[in-house]
A protein has these predicted regions:
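Short runs within selected transmembrane alpha-helices of multi-pass transporters and secretion channels
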Residues: 159-177, 185-193, 214-229, 308-311, ...
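Short alpha-helical transmembrane segments in multi-pass integral membrane proteins
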Residues: 1-39, 97-164, 206-262, 318-383, ...
Length: 467
């Protein structure tokens, strides 16, 4: 057998073996073993994201200047919006390219790949221009108080300069998966995150650069991710190309690609607007309130992020058994994932509440600000155990292929419900109401999501029994 043919045969046999092994895991292994096998890698990936999101604020907090902590919190939402656009483009590009390859439409795949590359760079350049030319206007909209303007402007301008790198790395880490190249996207983002975490203490503490150092570390992390993805595209990809001629062949595909990725980014867009509105309300009470709320949020985010990671990991398990109409196993999966996520939520929430002063102290050094953060933290964790049901319901709807209800659920908690809750609760209860709005929004989102989940499950039972 020729060597090339032998390699192809071996690769096919390996893929077939992996597929059979995965099917056995989905179908035959104990539910607990299947859940943990699938959830652990997902949770580890989520934890890296949590550490990445905490790093800047943690090391800035070590300076003992809570104003700089608040500055980071104020600027965050506008870059979340930019990331949401990148997520839409990346997820849409991955789906459209993969579908085109499956249909043997390689020219379409190349056009979409080139559009994703150049659109991410172009969007990043436009974002950079807007952020640099309208810094004060944007910061005013974001809720920056007078004492935050200097730090926030510096932080935003440095990050803005690296926006093309950020958007490119987010978009292409998703798009390369369309060719089956899972590792390059994951490893590039991981390398960028590790670079950021290593450089943060060097620039922030060692060189005493504060928020400027934090921003530079972030940009350099994105640069590392971009370089690794660029090397892969140029050396290993058979479809993706930096040649603009492919993008110019069918530019109309860009709108279709963005539309396909809309469900993946819309929740992040709404979350960014909700965070901006929250900071606008918090600014009424000064930068100390913004810093306190940011510290409370960072201290508790690990709870919901791990719950989300568990449910994301279990999603293919639910999808396989939903497709097989294995109702007893579906029921067992739902029950055990609920037990795991809610049980973890209860334990972690209790731990966070008992250790709230120490957690807040990681980010805030001023005693008065830390006390505000501890008080606000209660409202952010009180409903967190229930969010296990929320993420389980959302992932079950996705696994069932109900894109509409899955999208509705994804925009509820941090967007469609939270924004009106912030307005109403602040009107009645002031600063405390801003934090309590998250509790009300979470509970309402859980009730709606679980209702949709039960409806979908009963539909499966009903349609299966009639066959």
């Amino acid at each position: 057998m020729p060597r090339a043919a032998f390699r192809l045969y071996a690769q096919q046999e390996e893929e077939r073996s992996d597929s059979v092994g995965n099917e056995a895991l989905f179908r035959d292994k104990s539910v607990w073993k299947a859940i943990f096998t699938l959830a652990i890698p997902s949770v580890l990936t989520i934890l890296i994201m949590v550490i990445y999101n905490m790093a800047d604020m943690f090391f800035i907090g070590m300076l003992g200047d809570d104003t700089q902590v608040a500055a980071i919190a104020v600027v965050g939402p506008v870059f979340s919006l930019a990331t949401a656009v990148a997520t839409m483009l990346g997820a849409g590009g991955c789906a459209v390219i993969a579908k085109s390859l499956g249909a043997q439409e390689h020219d379409t795949a190349r056009s979409v790949g080139s559009l994703c590359i150049w659109s991410s760079i172009l969007f990043g350049a436009v974002f950079t221009t807007v952020m640099l030319t309208a810094t004060d206007i944007v910061l005013g909209f974001l809720g920056a108080t007078e004492d935050l303007m200097g730090y926030a402007a510096t932080y935003m301008r440095v990050l803005a300069l690296g926006s093309p790198l950020m958007l490119f790395s987010v978009v292409m880490a998703s798009v390369v998966r369309a060719e089956g190249a899972i590792l390059p996207g994951m490893l590039s983002n991981m390398a960028g995150t590790v670079t950021n975490i290593i450089l943060d203490p060097v620039f922030i503490l060692g060189l005493n650069m504060g928020v400027t150092g934090a921003a530079i570390a972030t940009v350099l992390g994105n640069l590392v991710a971009t370089l690794l993805l660029t090397i892969f595209i140029r050396k290993r990809s058979g479809i993706l190309s930096f040649s603009p001629q492919y993008a110019l062949q069918r530019p109309g595909l860009l709108l279709h690609t963005m539309a396909v990725g809309l469900p993946n980014g819309i929740s992040s867009v709404l979350s960014g607007f909700a965070s901006t509105f929250s900071n606008q309300l918090l600014s009424i009470y000064g930068s100390s309130a913004i810093a306190a709320m940011a510290a409370a949020g960072r201290s508790t985010m690990v709870i919901t992020m791990i719950q989300m990671g568990i449910c994301m990991g279990a999603s293919p398990l639910m999808a396989y058994n939903y497709g097989a109409r294995n109702i007893p196993r579906i029921r067992e999966i739902l029950q055990k994932v609920a037990i795991l996520t809610v049980g973890f939520g209860l334990t972690a929430a209790a731990g966070c509440y008992l250790g709230r002063d120490a957690l807040i102290g990681l980010f805030l050094k001023d005693a008065a600000n830390a006390e505000i953060g501890s008080n606000l933290m209660f409202f952010l964790i009180i409903a967190s155990p229930l969010l296990g049901f929320y993420y389980l319901s959302s992932n079950f709807l996705q696994a069932a292929g109900n894109a509409f209800l899955a999208t509705v659920v994804s925009i509820l908690r941090q967007g469609a419900l939270l924004i009106p809750c912030l307005y109403l609760m602040h009107s009645f209860f002031g600063l405390t109401g801003i934090a309590a709005a998250h509790t009300v929004s979470d509970v309402c989102a859980v009730i709606i999501a679980v209702s949709f989940c039960l409806w979908q499950y009963r539909k499966l039972v009903r349609t299966t029994s009639t066959q």
